[in-house]
Amino acid sequence: MIKDKIKNLDLSATLKINELSKNLEKDGKEVIKFGFGQSPFHVPDTIVDELKKNAFQKSYLPIQGLDKLRESIASYESKKKNKKFNSEQIIIGPGSKELMFLLHMSFSGEIIIPTPSWVSYKPQSLIADNKYHWINTTADNNWYPTAESLEELVSKDKDKSFLLILNSPNNPSGQICKNFKELSEVIKKYNIIVLSDEIYSDLTFDEKNESIFNHSPSNTIVSSGLSKWCGAGG
């Protein structure tokens, strides 16, 4: 009764490692965890207080999310990216992972995934029946695809639609993309859609974190959330 593509999916590697480490801790073992992106810091008091204040809310929400919240996010992103956003450009969901999955389900085309990358991009493509392509990265280019490798891939079939996933700062390398300008030229040339996963964008300390959006805004969908920078996963 369950589709083969679901039955044949592996458990998320990060969640699997986390469960294994929990069992080892139950057995009295000391475990140093490198495989799970759970913040060790407390959720900021302001976030906790606002959640408490609104715990009584039970009405069905607007489809795109609370108007006031969308307006606040639009204002924040406008300052961050030096580009005017309005609330109509913002969609709220139960988590960025779920919103990414909806994008996979909605997109009619092929997915380009840098390797190495976050473990859930590929399974989401499989469930959505989207063909995916791995694009190799190296330490020489900060673990991001080069413009040349991207063009080589998409130029083989110019009539197809492609969705490129870019995650900066990157999971698992922690590196920041340095070649947005070069990538954007290929993105605009072939009209590639970009999913810019910016879940770690507020966790950069040495420099301002740039976005591919600043170079190719018309082609870019930005994804972010609360789970990393304020430790509010779930």
Put a short name on every predicted segment:
Residues 2-94:
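N-terminal small-domain helix-loop-helix segment of the aminotransferase-like
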Residues 24-27, 128, 189-190:
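Helix C-cap/helix->beta junction micro-motif
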Residues 84-90, 109-110, 160, 218-219:
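Short acidic capping loops at alpha-helix termini that bridge into adjacent secondary structure
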Residues 105-166, 176:
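PLP-dependent aminotransferase-like
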Residues 113, 134, 194-196, 222-224:
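Hydrophobic residues in well-ordered beta-strands that form the structural core
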Residues 124-125, 186, 212:
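Hydrophobic/aromatic ligand-binding patch that stacks against planar heteroaromatic rings
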Residues 141-207:
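Active-site phosphate-binding strand-loop segment of PLP-dependent enzymes
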Residues 215-234:
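Active-site PLP attachment segment
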